[in-house]
Amino acid sequence: MPRPRKRQAGAAGPDKKQLSGKRTKTENSESASVKLENSSLEKTTTFKTCGKNLSNYWLMKSEPESRLEKGIDMKFSIEDLQAQPKQTTCWDGVRNYQAWNFLRAMKLEDEAFFYHSNCKQPGIVGLMKIVKEAYPDHTQFEKNDPHYDPSSKEDNPKWSMVDVQFVRMMKRFISLDELKTYHQAHKATGGPLKSMTLFTRQRLSVQPLTQEEFDFILSLEEAEPS
């Protein structure tokens, strides 16, 4: 997850060959098979019709409230993103193999919900877009960073990040409680949020959305909170 004090997006230089792995603020490193995660990735993040890839949609979590980890404040809210140069930053620190696979699957102009997590009122607060596809995450090499990985080498990096840019605030805050209410109802009726990853893989801080899920959540902006 990005932090205001970090270098500007793209500062790590040109993209290198495909890497492997990354973390999000709320995730810990997991011992997992990359092969298994790649299989999961194919099933959950690439939507195809007649052999053509459709747009991908995402939900990306970040912590809006201060929390120190190894002396560094992990806070990064949507307001912090708005305050960045060109309202753009690198989404670094992902250290979970499945989340890393999701980051690698992201394409330019993919849309993502900015989700405030690990706070008093978790939920969706805004929209952003992917403006640079996966490239090496510089924090894996920085010894003083909470996400330093001594097993990762600059000539063979393990973890990746993407660059994101603020698009807009949501017209209203969409809370976790509201989403959960719809999820539970849709499990019974077959509605759009019946299988939403936010509730089936809660700890993942980078999550895929189907277009149906994305469109339904956008439609909630115009509705009264449930």
Swiss-Prot record:
Region annotated Disordered sits at 1-38
Composition bias type Polar residues, residue spans: 29-38
Domain of life of the organism in this record? Answer: Eukaryota
Cell location? Nucleus
Pfam families attached to this UniProt entry: EVE
Q: How is it modified after translation?
A: Phosphorylated.
Q: Name one GO cellular component term.
A: nucleus
Arranged from A to Z, the UniProt key words for this protein are: Nucleus, Phosphoprotein
UniProt main location, coarse: nucleus
- Compositionally biased residues, Basic and acidic residues: 14-28
Q: Where is this motif: Nuclear localization signal?
A: 5-10
- InterPro entries the UniProt entry points to: 5hmC_binding (IPR052181), EVE_domain (IPR002740), PUA-like_sf (IPR015947), THYN1-like_EVE (IPR047197)
Q: What does this protein do?
A: Specifically binds 5-hydroxymethylcytosine (5hmC), suggesting that it acts as a specific reader of 5hmC.
Q: What is this protein called?
A: Thymocyte nuclear protein 1
What is the species listed in this Swiss-Prot or TrEMBL entry? Rattus norvegicus (Rat)
In the UniProt record, what gene is named as encoding this protein? Answer: Thyn1
